[in-house]
Amino acid sequence: MGQRQMHLGVYAVGTGNHIAGWRHPGATTSGEDFEAFKTIAASAERGKLDFVFVGDSLAFLVEGHPGQMVRFEPLTLLSALSSVTSRIGLVGTASSSYSEPYTIARQFSSLDHLSGGRAGWNVVTTTLTEAAQNYGYDELPEHDLRYEIATEFVEVVRGLWDTWEDGGRVVNRQTGQYYDPSKVHALDHKGKHFSVKGPLNLTRAPQGHPVIVQAGASTSGRQLAARYGEVIFAVQLDKDECRAFYDDVKRQVVAFGRRAEHCNIMPGLVTVVGRTDEEARAKLAQLMEYVDPTSAMRTLSRRFGHDMSKFPLDGPVPDLPLSNLMHSYNKVASSKARRLGLKLRDLYNEMALARGYPLVCGGPATVSDFMEEWFKDGAVDGFTLLPAHFPEAFDDFIDLVIPELQRRGLFRKDYQGTTLRDHLGLPKPENRFARAPQASAAAVE
């Protein structure tokens, strides 16, 4: 067996991932620039990354980061990108709170067909009151109820993906038979939140099921991730917290009857890369000159689900109740603050630097050392890269860090397959409706 290698994806934001990255000279500045996303996807494919990840929000957010203000709908964008790429995985976000299982099943199955088996669905429950108000509700459903709905939602979608067995479409011009009725099945789901008959009006996707991605860190979020998640986009601020998260989720994965290696933990990582450490630090210092202080505080408040501007920056991080909006960052940041004795200003500075994600700044060796340590210490299976801005900061990573990771044997030099499941080392799911092969009745002579 060869050396274990890490997985890498990139979180594609037209305005960059640093809170002020879009202000950098030469940076892309729009979430509506298809050419910019084509460039990101091409660089990701050139670097042999596993996937491009496109997030979403269902509302216009008056927040510090313009990536939350204007953005393409992910499935539309990824369908377009499928026609100008050939290997890179295409992961898009869609909400289980403001769609229907049949719609989501069709959309991601369509993307999987269009891309030749490269689709992934990032399941979110939506944390924005503004989104609820755009869909006819005054408030979000309660946190645990959102995850209860999401669990049934995902189960229905996976069931719909199985309603066609492989080989269900026959297309026999001589006999006039188009499909095999014995290989097409009704789902007939009747649950607490959804009633869905099926079958899907698409044949089985090339991957069987598009890859399921999840990012929950709350108790109910981790349960959803462990039950179904094949990639986990974790929000962890340091290695020890991430290793504890990793061990907990993997334990739950096994408890659900799955194999631990079929769930890849890939936390977000903001990267600022230079040819040397000194050059990288100069790049980060330049970025910080562009930061609007109020935008960092607004972002910090949204991540906590409370107005943090009411508290003194040089005081302790307040012990606040979990809001109905976001549990993940509040729990992780509060735990870190208690453990390390951090002040609110420390979290504010982290938000200004990297919007609450860990940040690594340095030359190829420094960045690779950081990633290798987390990987070999059992905290991650890889990373979802959040370059400070596009295209330059991402190209710096591809051109400088990827060769160093490859030299160390930590990352692939070429793709070994064509589908996202191939890249991630995931099997094609069995079809729940497929009949077991009949045992041979031939006599033994």
Regions from the PLM with identified roles:
Residues 6-10, 52-54, 88-94, 117-123, ...:
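Hydrophobic faces of well-ordered beta-strands that scaffold small-molecule active sites
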Residues 329-400:
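Substrate-recognition/cap regions that form aromatic- and gly/pro-loop-enriched pockets
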Residues 135, 142, 153-158, 243-251, ...:
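C-terminal helical cap(s) of enzyme catalytic domains, especially alpha/beta-barrels
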Residues 65-91, 254-256, 394-413:
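Alpha-helix-loop-beta-strand connector modules within alpha/beta enzyme cores
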Residues 31-44, 214-227, 363-377:
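Short, acidic/polar
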Residues 2-5, 100-223, 227-228, 254-256, ...:
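Internal, glycine-rich beta/alpha segment that forms the wall or movable "lid"
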Residues 1-85, 207-210, 435-445:
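N-terminal beta1-alpha1-beta2 module of alpha/beta enzyme domains
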Residues 20-35, 93-102, 138-140, 206-219, ...:
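Active-site mouth loops of central-metabolism enzymes
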